Design a protein with these regions (language model features):
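Short amphipathic alpha-helical surface patches that mediate protein-protein
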Residues: 12, 119-120, 154
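Extracytoplasmic thiol/disulfide redox context detector
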Residues: 2, 6-91, 163-166, 170, ...
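C-terminal cap of thioredoxin/glutaredoxin-like
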Residues: 2, 6, 28, 56, ...
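Glycine-rich, flexible loop/turn motifs
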Residues: 37-38, 98, 121, 149
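Short, flexible micro-motifs
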Residues: 46, 102, 192
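Structural alpha/beta surface segment adjacent to cysteine/selenocysteine redox centers
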Residues: 55-58, 63-140
Length: 206
C-alpha cells in the first residue's frame, strides 16, 4: 500500500512538473505577470471575472470596441463590481507605441482617461498626413505641453516597459487586436455587448 501511494504521489508530481513546463503553462504565467509599470484595473480585486484586453491605439477594431461596446460593458459589469478589467499595451506600430507612452507618462491614474481619449479621437490623430503633430495637439487636451510631450517620447524606461508588455502578450498567444482574456480564456476581435453577455453570464452564475 505504501509503495502504491508513493508511486501515485510521484506520478502526480511528475504530471504537475510537466504542466508547469508546458507552453500553455508558460503562456498563463506571461498572462498573469503585469508589466513593469503595473496593470491599471477597473473593478474590485475580488471580482468573480477578470478581463484583460490587449489593444493597439491605432487599431480600428479596438477603437470600435471602445466606442460602441466599452461604455455598456463598464456600466453593466464593472461599475457594478461583477467584473474587473484592464487594458494592456500591444502597439502594432511606432505611433501606437508613442500613444501608450504618453498614456503612461503622467502616472497610472491618468492612463484610462488618456487611452479613452486616444481611442475616441483616433481618426483625428492616427490617420492624418502628420500624425505626430496631430498627436501632440491631441494630448495637450490632457495637460501636456510641447516640452513634456517631447520629453515623454524620449523616455527609454517607458518605451522598454511598453515593449515588455507587448512581448509577454505575444508569448501568451496575442496575435491580433483586440484580444481579450476572460478568466484566462482567449477571445479575439471587437466583441459585441451580446457576445460579452453570452460569455460573462455563465461565469458569473457558476
Amino acid at each position: 500500500m505504501t509503495n502504491r501511494r508513493q508511486l501515485l504521489t510521484a506520478t502526480a508530481g511528475l504530471a504537475a512538473a510537466a504542466m508547469l513546463g508546458s507552453p500553455a503553462a508558460h503562456a498563463q504565467a506571461d498572462l498573469a505577470t503585469p508589466g513593469p509599470l503595473g496593470d491599471v484595473w477597473l473593478g474590485p480585486a475580488d471580482a468573480k471575472v477578470s478581463i484583460i484586453e490587449y489593444a493597439s491605439l491605432t487599431c480600428g477594431h479596438c477603437a470600435t470596441f471602445h466606442k460602441d461596446t466599452w461604455p455598456a460593458l463598464k456600466a453593466k459589469y464593472i461599475d457594478t463590481g461583477k467584473v474587473r478589467f484592464t487594458l494592456r499595451e500591444f502597439p502594432l506600430d511606432p505611433l501606437a507605441t508613442a500613444g501608450f507612452m504618453l498614456a503612461r507618462c503622467n502616472g497610472n491614474d491618468k492612463y484610462v482617461a488618456m487611452t479613452d481619449l486616444l481611442f475616441a479621437q483616433q481618426k483625428v490623430w492616427a490617420f492624418t498626413d502628420k500624425p505626430v503633430d496631430a498627436l501632440s495637439t491631441m494630448v495637450k487636451q490632457a495637460g501636456f505641453t510641447q516640452d513634456s510631450f517631447e520629453a515623454c517620447l524620449k523616455r527609454q524606461d517607458i518605451y522598454d516597459a511598453v515593449t515588455v508588455v507587448k512581448d509577454r502578450g505575444a508569448k501568451a498567444g496575442v496575435d491580433s487586436t483586440p484580444t481579450f482574456f476572460i478568466n484566462g480564456q482567449k477571445r479575439s476581435g471587437a466583441l459585441s455587448m451580446a457576445e460579452f453577455d453570452k460569455i460573462l453570464e455563465p461565469l458569473l452564475a457558476g
